[in-house]
């Protein structure tokens, strides 16, 4: 019995399902989840001392790779001064100034402790600003686990085969209108019917919780135009794409400006953190300036600010994102070539340093239906074969993968060699 198997059995005694986030349980791919004890650079090491090239990256934040020395030094330095104050710090202002300088649509920001808090707060703010109740989201897009957003959600909800969560009252969900991702005609029709009741449209500009589905040409631009027409607040959930697909996020990458944006993951450098921000006119509606209440004991935590500031400064160097994107492109090209050579139906998608892998005969992946039509069982087999080869992919056919600047030629070769062997065994 492996150490991970023993730990998983023990964990299930007092932790529901043995994990603290459902997708970690390997339900989608089968088998026992790996328990990790160390991470450095492009690698993670499990409790049985096996090392893997990591394409999960703690599900997105580790864009520099694990245990970057500058980030660790920043956290160690802050540790000498305390863990949390429950009061303002200079670093919070530094972070706000830096984030607003990197993302031009931001005029003001508020720090929180998670991506879920960020999206929940942004939606409350949009409702308070507009005086309207309804929101529009898209099938397969996951915006955290607040009640009103667990309607046809992505991420773990897809791997469990359920569209939403038990425990969410119908009254909470009735104001959540769900439309097909990448279908601008459906949005136009809905707003023509009920636009006067819609406070906001929230969207992952790249849907990263039903694997990785980039926006169709004109989709984000269409959302911007329709929101302007109907007085609806446009919210980009950039918890995943922020500072990853480009330094200015997906809004810079695709050239579309939202009214509000939510962030997480990279902005904390690996520490628990979230952030939302946008137009001053809207943000000034938040307490203590306005009537929309939002608060948090650990918001702006100094350890998270230290890690996040250091990370954002490091990724701001010229050429950083071009290098990250180039590695990701070469990785996907290599995987596609090896799948084609083995006669395996396989499609990849990419947005900067995030990617999707699909066992599908489709020409492209554009819709929720395209994602659901892919072969999740075959992905599960591929996942375990890649593990045997020393490569750790996301343990779900419905989660995006992530590269880091620590991934280099050695990791690329190891990954592609493992994939070549894996595809051969899938024939």
Swiss-Prot record:
Quaternary data: Homodimer.
Localization (cell): Cytoplasm
PROSITE patterns referenced in this protein's UniProt entry, alphabetically: AA_TRANSFER_CLASS_3 (PS00600)
Record protein name field: Glutamate-1-semialdehyde 2,1-aminomutase
GO molecular function: glutamate-1-semialdehyde 2,1-aminomutase activity; pyridoxal phosphate binding; transaminase activity
Isomerase is among the record's keywords: yes
Associated pathway: Porphyrin-containing compound metabolism; protoporphyrin-IX biosynthesis; 5-aminolevulinate from L-glutamyl-tRNA(Glu): step 2/2
